[in-house]
Each structure stands twice: as C-alpha cells, then as structure tokens.
C-alpha cells in the first residue's frame, strides 16, 4: 500500500470514527499532495509525499514555538496533536546510536 493510499484509507477511517483532528490534518496533507500533482502535472511518489509531510511538520513546529511564546495553550495543544498525526506517516529517523554503528 502506497503512502497516498494509506492516507486516503486513514482519512475515511477518521471520518467514520469522528476523529476531527486526524481527519482535518490528513485533509491538509491530501490537499498539499493534490496541489503538487496539479502544479507539476505528474503523479507524486512516496518520497515526494514524505517530503510534503516533513514540510508540514516543520511548519507546525515553527508555529508551535511562536504560540508557546504568546501563551496560546489552545493552539499549542492543537498543533501538538497535528504533529503527532503527521509523524505517523513519516519514515522512522535513525537515532544517533544507529548512525554510529
């Protein structure tokens, strides 16, 4: 199952289970994927989707720092939940210990 198929299946599951944060986060990612495909007139592969996911996580982490400084705990919690959803689809990063081996 490709990453795109997995996102679509998880989106449907989130809708059925009324998981709004998960559904909205996956929806944002699906929109970014669709935008890429329309702009470049080509089907995106898993590596491209992983790149989009990494950018989405980075954007949310950058905004998270600003929200923490401003004391917006509601947005901090929301963005943390979105980051958690997004990181489920990213490939696992090698730890520093594994890199040394």
What kind of region is each of these model predictions?
Residues 1-101:
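N-terminal cationic and glycine-rich segments that engage phosphates or anionic surfaces
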């Amino acid at each position: 199952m490709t990453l795109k198929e997995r996102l679509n299946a998880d989106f449907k599951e989130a809708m059925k289970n009324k998981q709004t944060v998960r559904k909205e986060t996956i929806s944002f990612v699906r929109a970014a994927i669709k935008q890429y495909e329309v702009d470049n007139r080509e089907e995106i592969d898993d590596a491209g989707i992983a790149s989009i996911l990494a950018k989405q996580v980075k954007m949310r982490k950058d905004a998270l720092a600003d929200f923490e400084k401003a004391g917006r705990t509601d947005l901090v919690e929301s963005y943390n939940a979105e980051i958690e959803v997004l990181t489920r689809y990213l490939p696992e990063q090698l730890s520093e210990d594994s890199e040394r081996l």
